[in-house]
Amino acid sequence: MMKTGDEADLSVDAALRAKTCKNHSATHLLQKALREVLGTHVEQAGSYQDGERTRFDFSHFAAMTPEELEKVEKIVNDKIAEAIPVRTDVMTVDEAKKTGAMALFGEKYGETVRVVSMGDFSKEFCGGTHVKNTSEIAAFKIISENGVAAGVRRIEALTGDNVFAYYRNLEKELLEAAKAAKATPATLTEKIEHMQAEIKALTSENESLKSKAAKEALGDVMDQID
């Protein structure tokens, strides 16, 4: 139990901070990518980052299509590959607005604000921790998109080593599924389609036999009545 006057050492978890930085900076790229793909009606409705993932809530009226998600993901990864320097500047609110920096809707700001810029692609009011260059994010992968309230969607995504771990896990599951189906990853889809066709044929044959048996049973009953 600590008491007044006790000394303590304070240190930053560098590894956790680095992962959180990647997720936070990726979220800035994500918001701009969403506005490019879906429209400028997209605004932040909530945001959370830790060392594992980023979670971003935004205004939108419908579930995103697979094609839209793919476009957004590609834009973010393209900006990561461009190795854009991440710059921070402190300026007055009026100066920040003149730069075109995005502010959080409904948020009240003081006389000065911090603006985080990623080239000409993304500029936002932000006081959080970030990478120094988008290349540090390494990779970006959307893992889910769903609704959380009327007119509000949520995206969860991974960055860096967590993306590679995600794909390694998918590969492991694919190999296990292929083994169970006595196929290879390359032939798994074909094998599943073949199995589905067999099941459909057997189901149809079973229904036909049941119908035939029912008719025969009915015939026996009618014979007994006669």
Describe each PLM feature range.
Residues 48-55:
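Short, conserved phosphate-binding/catalytic loop or strand-edge motifs used
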Residues 41, 51, 134-226:
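Terminal appendage regions of diverse proteins
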Residues 55-148:
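Non-catalytic interaction/regulatory segments
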Residues 1-11, 15:
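Conserved nucleotide-binding/hydrolysis modules and their immediate coupling elements
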Residues 14-24:
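Short pre-active-site segment immediately N-terminal to the catalytic Zn-binding motif
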Residues 33-46:
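Active-site palm subdomain of RNA-directed nucleic acid polymerases
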Residues 22-35, 125-133:
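Histidine-centered catalytic micro-motifs
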